[in-house]
Amino acid sequence: MAGEEDWIELKFRLADGTDIGPSKYNQSMTVSSLKEKLISQWPKDKENTPKTVNDMKLINAGKILENNRTLAESRLPVCELPGMIITMHIVLRLPTLDKKSEKLQNDPPMKNRCVCTIL
């Protein structure tokens, strides 16, 4: 079938070792739209959940996939066998700096500061 070649079977491994998939995806799909689909399929029992596509990185064969490229452009056919399920890793980069900066802004400034004087 010619239409079968347009599809790729992917499985996604999370940091804790659990998987999403395997499922078939069209190779013309962009990495960004794939990430949106993954956010909607994200396991509800997980503590960390990505909110946007920028909260996660997809890694295939050691390469970080770019959001604006298609799955066909992002594939590394050297590592693949026909009919094989490709495992990609998901790395979350959730915004933690906002919490730290809010904490620093909400903390009162230190009033007792040590001052050294050399005579």
UniProtKB/Swiss-Prot annotation:
Lipid-anchored residues (S-palmitoyl cysteine): C114
Sites bearing Cysteine methyl ester, chain numbering: C116
Gene3D superfamilies attached to this UniProt entry: Phosphatidylinositol 3-kinase Catalytic Subunit, Chain A, domain 1
UniProt xrefs under CDD domains: Ubl_MUBs_plant
Induction entry: Not induced by pathogens, cycloheximide and ozone treatment.
Residue span(s) of the pro-peptide: 117-119
Membrane-topology descriptor: Lipid-anchor
Lipid anchor positions (S-geranylgeranyl cysteine): C116
UniProt main location, coarse: membrane
Pfam families referenced in this protein's UniProt entry, alphabetically: Rad60-SLD_2
Keyword terms: Cell membrane, Lipoprotein, Membrane, Methylation, Palmitate, Prenylation
Known tissue expression: Ubiquitous.
GO cellular component, one term: plasma membrane
Compartments where located: Cell membrane
Residues of the Ubiquitin-like domain: 8-76
Remaining remarks: Heat stable and remains soluble at temperatures exceeding 90 degrees Celsius.
Known function: May serve as docking site to facilitate the association of other proteins to the plasma membrane.
Protein's name in the database: Membrane-anchored ubiquitin-fold protein 6
Species of origin: Arabidopsis thaliana (Mouse-ear cress)
Source species taxonomy: Eukaryota, Viridiplantae, Streptophyta, Embryophyta, Tracheophyta
Gene: MUB6
